[in-house]
Amino acid sequence: MAEKIFDESKFNGQIAVILGSGLGKITSNIKNSISIQYISIPHYPQTTVEGHPGELVLGTLHDIDILIAKGRFHYYEGYSFEEITIPIQLFSRLGIKYLIITNSAGSMNLNHPPGNFMVADSHMDCTFRSDSNDPEIRSHSIFHDPSLIQLAKSSAKKLEQEINTGTYCWTLGPCYETPAEIKNMRYLGGDAVGMSTVPEIVTAAKLGIKTLTLSCLTNYAAGISRSPLTHHEVVMNAKKFDKNFSNVIIEIIKKID
């Protein structure tokens, strides 16, 4: 897989970004871009969910070599932990040192309304699934890079964008959580909830990649708002907030050493 990327792009960067549902505007800022479809990469998983196109975009952003994954994989698509994290393994082989993981998430915190952004300083695995080949116990302190968190906060402040820190909760999906489940996660300290991201965080930490997780809060979680939840609504709201979200990511990338 890595050989194909090197052959087609001559990529020599250290920063990668994974885009969540409906989040893709940042790629319009990439110069000298090359697009590689997932389907053309040997042994690479394929996306099946709306809002996840399924391509790698490589190029430069403010003269910085960058790799962007448009589309990710989820447990509910039938993939294993190992398959979900194939992109992270690939990034490591490509020499990636910094990873920005994004997602569209439901807010469980009334102080973090839809349209705001959240940087994860901790996470909660509500699936109780793990890499079957790696039962190693790890400290949570290695998962979320403090310097990147500070960089995200200062970048958002510069752009006058509201950003909060909080705990991201991972659920299996594809069904949205019940109000009772949301109530329980809020009681345990959760601030945002989604169906992805944590396997990527764990694998990146194992591989020594410094990781930042950013959530675009697209809706309130079940039981907080009276509106019924749909994936289409999540994607539409993500697209509505995508410009400001992308600007924050660009500012962060510009500041990474």
Task: Give the positions of each predicted feature.
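Metabolite-binding pocket within alpha/beta catalytic cores that recognizes anionic/polar moieties
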Residues: 1-140
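Short acidic/polar active-site loop segments enriched in Thr and Asp
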Residues: 97-98, 191, 210
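His/Asp/Glu-rich mid-to-C-terminal helical/loop segments that flank catalytic regions of hydrolases
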Residues: 222-257
